[in-house]
């Protein structure tokens, strides 16, 4: 058990008791009511307790790509830098990159992430060791080649079955076709069928750039969402669509009608000059908007508090509307909405919810006066949380990793980077 004493929880100073992996009680919990030998007691004095953040679009091993290819367009970034480096990946490099990314996320309050990449065995190993929660998809790209398609689908199916056999409630599987401009119709149709067969979500890149939309238009005479919808890609499945930068009204209507979750990546989209997602229109249509960081190669951070602030600011600016995306809305994008997208019983601090939360010491200049803490978390907090509990287990205590040797992670990451770039 874990007992957090005297923290600010939902606006009030109170205690929180964790039993197993569930928040058992919020209120007054005297120490005398728990077994001291079996309970981790955390002093929450001067701390606010918040739900763990949920990052709905990542490529976690790409933490090793941080700063590698800055300030260039997306297609040049991919073809000239990222894809050539990815051809050198191996299990050791992916493991090191995942460890580094998981540590960064935990230390900035993220308790769950939605990932699409390769070498899933290595990703799973690192996720298991660090204690973070994850939905993991094998990234499929067939480039319209039949032989490649069969291999990709076989690999994706194998990964889903492997994750299910783990029987680890923190690690769940998904299907990850890269995008409509890199995946054939046959692969996308098979993805929907497999998602229904295995009861897993789909994670896909959509409408990130004008160029990719034009590629799909040229091939199909339809925009990407219209094209995928024409053969039932979104039917009877949960779909998380990353980016959604360039959308017309028809596509927004499809997103709403098919209950698609949008993973908004404002910083990555700005850095690659992809554009700004029409969040104002999405909100008007009651679309569930979540937040993602994308990979470190295009961000260069996994700090979701930065995404909250950017999301709250950029849409005010481009729409000349100071009330658009409030601090409360931005915070929910990064917590409750993300939890809904990944079907995680978290995202808010309530009895019966999963014990995924972070503690933040409010005795900091940028969190004072504490009466305005909801605003501070979005507009002024730097993301450096003090303690983190994931699935009822303490993973970060007083700013230091509990589950893994942090110094060793940095050593492995440096070694992996040198191997990747030699």
UniProtKB/Swiss-Prot annotation:
Q: Name one Pfam family in it.
A: Amidohydro_1
Does Zinc count among this protein's keywords? yes
EC code: 3.5.4.41, 3.5.4.31, 3.5.4.4, 3.5.4.28
Q: What class of enzyme is it?
A: hydrolase
Which biological processes are named by the entry's GO terms? Answer: S-adenosylmethionine biosynthetic process
Protein residues bound to substrate: 86, 178, 208, 294
Catalysed reaction(s)? 5'-deoxyadenosine + H2O + H(+) = 5'-deoxyinosine + NH4(+); S-adenosyl-L-homocysteine + H2O + H(+) = S-inosyl-L-homocysteine + NH4(+); S-methyl-5'-thioadenosine + H2O + H(+) = S-methyl-5'-thioinosine + NH4(+); adenosine + H2O + H(+) = inosine + NH4(+)
Cofactor(s), names only, from the UniProt record: Zn(2+)
Which Cys pairs does UniProt list as disulfide-bonded? none
Pathway(s) where this gene product acts = Amino-acid biosynthesis; S-adenosyl-L-methionine biosynthesis
How the cofactor is bound: the record states: Binds 1 zinc ion per subunit.
Where are its TM segments located? none
Question: What molecular function terms (GO) are annotated for this protein?
Answer: 5'-deoxyadenosine deaminase activity; 5'-methylthioadenosine deaminase activity; adenosine deaminase activity; metal ion binding; S-adenosylhomocysteine deaminase activity
Q: Which UniProt keywords apply?
A: Hydrolase, Metal-binding, Zinc
Residues recorded as binding Zn(2+), renumbered to this chain, are 57, 59, 205, 294
Q: Which domain of life is it from?
A: Archaea
The subunit structure is: Homotetramer.
**Family per similarity comment:** Belongs to the metallo-dependent hydrolases superfamily. MTA/SAH deaminase family.
Additional info? SAH is a product of SAM methyltransferases and is known to be a feedback inhibitor of these enzymes. As a result of this inhibition, organisms have evolved efficient enzymes to metabolize SAH via different pathways. The pathway found in methanogens differs from the canonical pathway, it uses the deamination of S-adenosyl-L-homocysteine to form S-inosyl-L-homocysteine for the regeneration of SAM from S-adenosyl-L-homocysteine. 5'-deoxyadenosine is a radical SAM enzyme reaction product which strongly inhibits radical SAM enzymes.
HAMAP family recorded = MTA_SAH_deamin
The record ties this protein, via PANTHER family, to: AMIDOHYDROLASE-RELATED DOMAIN-CONTAINING PROTEIN (PTHR43794:SF11), AMINOHYDROLASE SSNA-RELATED (PTHR43794)
Q: What does this protein do?
A: Catalyzes the deamination of three SAM-derived enzymatic products, namely 5'-deoxyadenosine, S-adenosyl-L-homocysteine, and 5'-methylthioadenosine, to produce the inosine analogs. Can also deaminate adenosine. The preferred substrate for this enzyme is 5'-deoxyadenosine, but all these substrates are efficiently deaminated. Likely functions in a S-adenosyl-L-methionine (SAM) recycling pathway from S-adenosyl-L-homocysteine (SAH) produced from SAM-dependent methylation reactions.
Q: Specify the protein name.
A: 5'-deoxyadenosine deaminase
